[in-house]
């Protein structure tokens, strides 16, 4: 669910391993939700002029905006949401996917989502929103790969 079907090799990466280690310090999901809320403070916030329908993620329970830019061959994301827990989720996604080449983003297996139990602990609508957000972030990356062709 969190990766493209054509990629069969799961490559561990240090950022996702750090996320897994951080979440392993908490015994229950109330503490993990508190941690997600604290992560919302580190979210690279989208520019106010980009909080428009053009940047909104369809399929999310909350309002979510995501933007991407390419700098020195690496993709960087900014985002915002009207829900604080979602801001924490966005912060995790940006941490795991940002600062990579567009092709790396397209190919990245976001295995940390299953490893920390996130999928099982989100409501179905929040889970659908997470999938929609990941899809949009990958679409931005794919568009940047096409620009470089």
Q: Language-model features: where?
A:
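N-terminal amphipathic/basic-hydrophobic helices that include classical n-h-c signal peptides
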Residues: 1-9
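N-terminal intrinsically disordered, cationic/polar leader segments
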Residues: 9-63, 69-76, 113-149
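A generic alpha-helix surface/boundary motif
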Residues: 17, 87-88, 106-107
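Solvent-exposed interaction patches of small proteins and small membrane subunits
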Residues: 54-60, 81, 103-108
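Short, surface-exposed beta-strand-loop junctions and turns on beta-sheet-rich folds
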Residues: 83-85
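Alpha-helical support elements that line or immediately flank enzyme active sites
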Residues: 89-100
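Glycine-rich phosphate/pyrophosphate-binding loops
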Residues: 99-116
């Amino acid at each position: 669910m969190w990766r493209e079907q054509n990629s069969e090799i799961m490559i561990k990466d240090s950022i996702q391993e750090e996320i897994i280690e951080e979440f392993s310090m908490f015994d229950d999901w109330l503490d993990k939700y508190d941690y997600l809320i604290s992560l919302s403070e580190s979210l690279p916030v989208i520019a106010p002029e980009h909080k428009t329908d053009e940047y909104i993620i369809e399929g999310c329970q909350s309002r979510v905006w995501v933007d991407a830019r390419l700098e020195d061959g690496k993709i960087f994301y900014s985002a915002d949401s009207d829900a604080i827990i979602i801001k924490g989720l966005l912060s995790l996604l940006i941490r795991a996917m940002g600062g990579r080449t567009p092709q790396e983003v397209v190919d990245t297996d976001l295995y940390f989502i299953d490893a920390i139990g996130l999928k099982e602990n989100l409501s179905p609508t929040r889970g659908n929103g997470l999938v929609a957000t990941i899809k949009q972030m990958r679409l931005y990356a794919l568009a940047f790969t096409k620009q470089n062709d």
